[in-house]
A protein has these predicted regions:
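Acidic helix N-cap motif at the loop->helix transition within catalytic regions
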Residues: 14-18, 42-51
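A conserved acidic beta->alpha catalytic loop
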Residues: 37-46, 97
Length: 241
């Protein structure tokens, strides 16, 4: 296997696009998918086990007894994959596949000795399809600007759930637990930037506008997090500065 995709799942039994996963797994022979069941209380475990049974060479399932939140669920999956696979590229996608598996795999070609971190961007252009509700877009741009200022980096979209890392960058970025369950993406940027230094980090990173991204309803982020998110960002900025 060359690449490993971590897919965190919390009560996703009714949202997982089974046909899309089946279509991908029946054709791709060089990518492993590791589903992390983050303490789900619905039938997520059963749905994931069906994938494991159908594609035993390409699917692994890690069941967590306690809900850790997206960031640390992804980290647990990454740590498992680092210890049990020889993959050279690691990353994650959301279970609803707002970004397709095929597009994630296409981005693996950009990971080289010189480029160790590739992240998708929901930047709408004339030649791509980015479907987001207007309100979410406006709020998202406000948050993205604040995050860019905190990082002191010209990053358009830190929060897109499509990211890829070289094996070395993976080990650096996921070495310790995250402060925030939802702003852990910001911590990834801080960790790599602090390790490499700003200039080298920028040289090793690549932000790629996605060809297709579709917002899916029933977000796991509660609206009340909009109030506590700023405190999380403050804690992250203080911890990594």
């Amino acid at each position: 296997m060359n690449a490993c995709i971590i897919v965190p799942c919390y009560n996703e039994a009714k949202r997982i696009p089974t046909p899309a996963f089946n279509s991908f797994l029946s054709k791709d022979s060089d990518t492993q998918i590791l589903f992390v069941n983050d303490g789900s209380t619905d039938d997520t475990a059963e749905v994931l086990q069906k994938f494991r049974t159908l594609y035993p060479k390409h699917v692994e399932v890690l069941n967590l007894e306690k809900n850790l939140g997206k960031g640390n669920a992804v980290r647990m999956g990454i740590q498992n994959a680092l210890h049990h696979t020889d993959c050279t590229v690691f990353g994650f996608l959301d279970a609803d596949l707002s970004t397709s598996l095929e597009e994630w795999v296409a981005l693996t070609q950009l990971i080289t000795d010189k480029t160790e971190f590739v992240f998708g961007s929901r930047f709408k252009k004339i030649d791509n399809s980015i479907e987001r509700k207007w309100f979410r877009f406006v709020v998202g741009r406000f948050i993205a600007t604040a995050i860019s200022k905190a990082l002191n980096l010209a990053v358009y979209d830190t929060q897109c759930g499509c990211k890829l890392f070289s094996r070395n960058a993976t080990q650096l970025a996921f070495a310790s637990p995250f402060i925030s369950p939802w702003l852990f993406d910001v911590e990834l940027f801080f960790r790599l930037k602090n390790h490499y230094g700003t200039a080298t980090f920028k040289a090793k990173s690549m932000e790629i506008p996605l060809k297709n991204w579709t917002h899916q309803e029933d977000s796991k982020i509660k609206w009340t997090y909009g109030f506590t998110m700023w405190f999380d960002l403050f804690k992250i900025k203080r911890a990594y500065s």
